[in-house]
């Protein structure tokens, strides 16, 4: 149905940050799923394709880079916009994420939740 909320998948091992983003996105009218490591994320992506993924890069089991690579090489997933939210601030990490298909890259210590939400609204439209 056209009125169903768009689904966002947050892949973040920091429970507090994940819950904060989830609450804010739900307030904006999105349906939100959460995965707390890369392995769980890959399982969820097999079950349901979200409109957008918010992805941390430093996670246990399967890293965010590995998840991003899997998304980029999987035909059913490769069109999903991926927004990185990470502590990795080196240009080489940002470039690697972009080469693997990340649409946006936010550094956690510099992030404005309002800027993040506005970018998500644009990319998930």
Regions found by a protein language model. Give the residues of each.
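Active-site residues of response regulator receiver
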Residues: 56, 86
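Receiver (REC) domain active-site loop signature in two-component systems and cognate sites
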Residues: 59
């Amino acid at each position: 149905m056209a009125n169903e909320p768009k689904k966002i998948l947050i892949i973040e091992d920091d429970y507090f940050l994940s819950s904060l983003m989830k609450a804010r996105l739900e307030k904006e009218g999105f349906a939100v799923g959460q995965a707390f490591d890369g392995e769980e994320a890959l399982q969820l992506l097999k079950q349901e394709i979200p409109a957008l993924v918010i992805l941390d890069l430093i996670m246990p089991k399967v890293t965010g880079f590995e998840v991003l690579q899997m998304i980029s090489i999987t035909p059913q997933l490769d069109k999903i916009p991926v927004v990185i939210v990470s502590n990795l601030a080196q240009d080489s990490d940002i470039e690697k994420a972009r080469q693997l298909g990340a649409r946006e890259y936010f550094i956690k210590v510099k992030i404005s939740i309002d800027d993040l939400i506005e970018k998500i609204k644009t990319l998930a439209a």
